[in-house]
Amino acid sequence: MEHCTFNLPDVQASKPSIAINLTRVGVTNVKKLVEIKRKDKRPIVLISTFDVFVDLPSDRKGANLSRNFEAVDEVLEKILSMPVYEIEQLCSDIAHNLLGRHEYANQAEVRMTSEYMIRRASPATGIKCQEVVNIFAEASAVRGQGNDDYFDVKKLIGAEVVGMTACPCAQEIMRDKAANELSELGVDKDTIIKFLERVPMATHNQRGRGIISIKVAHDFDVSLESIISIIDHSMSSSVYEVLKRADEKVVVETAHMNPKFVEDCVRTMADNVVKEFPNLPDNAVITIKQTNEESIHRHNAYAERVALMGDLRSEINHC
């Protein structure tokens, strides 16, 4: 009996009924185990989530999504044979690989999120604990006009860190009340001033969430550890998973001796980004966000700054 053979049509390559181009087509929530090597330290193993996209021209019905998985897997396999030190470079390599596989696409994007464990000690007793920091990276590759073999690659690295803030406004109200009460009790003015300088007044607190992301060209590297440190030190105090009573005293006192509005946190981060990264190019894109979860209000407080590094550097240097 003679068997008939059929050539299966490439449905994705057929023309769509509505011929418009699409900005992003791809896959989201792809889970992968990623090992990042470190100099003179043990590697970091991350359980990471990837979103992978390419653009789609108007004359094509669909994208070959299996190629997205192949691109991610191929680049991750290379980690076994060569050291990878930055998650943003990993995203950059995947984006570059995507454009090579999707010949019809002009742009590829990769996003990666993960939880990064850091070890730290409590401020007074030195109890060791592990803290979780949310980290993320992105990369985009754009095919060069007139040269399909040239890809313009940009990459982004960032982190979100949780801390604590103390409200300056409410603290001034309580400071004024304390001064009046002490005066009525017969305490002289100089003693009141000395007391208020040594003992911080009560105020309401917020759990703050600071975010910094830095976008650069493919040939620049940005320290993730520096980003995390900048965010952590921009708020009134760090927070810790485990605290003894002596530690609680230090955290509360530190926060109330360093009260900050949500705007102060963003400005502090901006100032420290300029100081910490003097070699960043002027066209690097800096995004800084701070959300303070209010304790006495139903709303949250928010502030943000997006700027080119050159503009930020110029503003701060002229303050």
UniProtKB/Swiss-Prot annotation:
Keyword Hydrolase in the entry? The reply is yes
| Pathway assignment | Cofactor biosynthesis; 5,6,7,8-tetrahydromethanopterin biosynthesis
The note on the cofactor says: Binds 1 Fe(2+) ion per subunit.
Q: Which GO terms describe its molecular function?
A: GTP cyclohydrolase I activity; GTP cyclohydrolase IV activity; iron ion binding
Tell me yes or no: is rRNA-binding among this UniProt entry's keywords: no
Q: Which reaction does it catalyse?
A: GTP + H2O = 7,8-dihydroneopterin 2',3'-cyclic phosphate + formate + diphosphate + H(+)
Entry keyword set: Hydrolase, Iron, Metal-binding
Q: Tell me its EC number(s), please.
A: 3.5.4.39
Q: Please indicate which residues carry the site annotation May be catalytically important.
A: 167
Write down the required cofactor(s).
Fe(2+)
Q: Which InterPro entries match?
A: GTP_cyclohydrolase_FolE2/MptA (IPR003801), GTP_cyclohydrolase_MptA (IPR022840)
Gene Ontology biological-process entries: tetrahydromethanopterin biosynthetic process
| Alphabetical list of HAMAP family matching this protein | GTP_cyclohydrol_A
Q: What does this protein do?
A: Converts GTP to 7,8-dihydro-D-neopterin 2',3'-cyclic phosphate, the first intermediate in the biosynthesis of coenzyme methanopterin.
**Family recorded in the similarity comment:** Belongs to the GTP cyclohydrolase IV family.
Subunit: Homodimer.
Q: What's the protein called, per UniProt?
A: GTP cyclohydrolase MptA
The protein's gene is named mptA
